[in-house]
């Protein structure tokens, strides 16, 4: 009889090792099944145990300066109480209760994750619970960590999330025996693909267009509730109906080291069991992301998915598939299915090895494939002849793509890039090539640049070097050269020379009123595509025609203002600063310089109005922070100490490196105000003070709404130079994980 029982146990363990249908270490038995004695843990100390408060643990981890040490302390405490009877160890002491099976299981998973190992130093982490998933996220605080250290952090995170998800799958997790907890964990891993439609149903409104599809996919990656962190890179071409994912898979060595096997209970997981379980789970991830993408975005007809593993030594692709909507509809992702068979039915490259794990295969696509990343997305807006209609034009404030341009020299730059392919070491051939390029383009600006370069080559002032010729072609005008001399003088702290070079460069232009504008034409300069889009939406007059000034024009006025102010010539500085702010109304630097010059000329009220104008249009953290710092100084000098404190507090919310200075100033303010201020103001108090003083709360609702609409429109229109700049700043302000995911999905500009 004993021999039969031993043979039966070995048979069941062998089935757990090799049976593909019995996934994740064995199918869960019906509730209540399993070896006798599994429920005996509940009888320790008369059924009295401590309980695992996961929400309380989450709060403690989030506030802890060393979450790993806190978790290590939890493990030590649980181990010390295993076997406790519930009776006091010494007279007068409180009873020592044993841990619940859930506590024991969490401690076990943390030990399996290597939390207590000393072979690698774990990096500093911060624990957060993202709102989209509600899971634990261990954010590594150090820029560079070893592969093993990162793997350990991810394993600790997985231990926390596995227990969290298992506890949600149990009716009474703190009363559940160990086998029920482990079986619940395994049910969670087997059912991950079933959440695809449920998560897709949370999206608001129809998903249409490039922006909506990218938002939906980024949201899904953040919202999936998975026991192991999902790191995914993706690309989208909504017009072509295609999305592609590259998933970082779970390596077998990161898989739990114990599993439930039907008839055996919880047993140590062999290497083969872990390879098979990890391989099956990783294949399910492909079904999850493809199923979600197709459910969330009706415009998509096909989803490409590749699963990869990067270790300290190599990179491997474990599967590569192109999953069509029709192929996936044959499977019920919410039911029981074989994920490897699903991928094979879609024509995937996938190769299970003899252990049940996945062997490396060739990846069938790249995230940079032109199908996913059409090159025309990065065509220069300045040179575009495309038009914008309907909602796209309304959102971007213009009807021509070229009216989103910011680079006055874009045409010269384009011709110079093409010209570089035909330049040689021969002056004669270079002159011929330059003149031919100018004739082919025909634009007066290009013809003038060509004449300038040809003259320089013939006179010997310009070398027969492709880089030198290209630079002269684009930035070789009198204004640019004069501005460069002024910049060099300013960097050398020669203020007199800097001012002279700048004003000399500006004299021929401003003396003739070249950029004064008339008959609805205005001349403007912009530092970013985001600035231009907001200018179109919120500043430009109806029917206005906007031409671009060279960047050197704005820089020359800025240098002239700084030089004059440093030499005590406040009125002269004000004239230059006012012109710079007029030409670049979205430039925070021009606005700050103007406010400083107004204050220097004895007009703090005008300086305050200019800073209010800056804050009413500010849309990035640096502009907002510096605007509030400047306003705080004015308020402090005017005796409005509480309002100044409110400005400093708003500044610290947006600034990076200068925040320390702002905090020190705020501390000085709090000390000056004393008891009457009650210390630091609450956000509500600070906002009320600013509103009462007529100071905008940046970014304003108007700016935020226009910014989001413009970002969406530029993405849908496929104007990615504009879209990426807008999206980057949207991320900086919102700090929203979904927007960051969208930003990562935007490909880099292709080589041309």
Map each language-model feature to its residues.
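"A position-specific structural signal for the A-helix of alpha-solenoid helical repeats
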Residues: 448-453, 463-465, 477-480, 484, ...
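Residue at a conserved register position within TPR or TPR-like alpha-solenoid repeats
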Residues: 489, 564, 598, 635, ...
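Short coil turns that delineate tetratricopeptide repeat
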Residues: 510, 551, 585, 619-622, ...
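Long, charge-dense low-complexity segments
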Residues: 2-427, 449-454, 466, 470, ...
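Alpha-helical linker/edge segments of TPR/alpha-solenoid repeat scaffolds
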Residues: 443-446, 454-465, 472, 526-545, ...
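TPR-repeat structural position
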Residues: 495-496, 570, 604, 641, ...
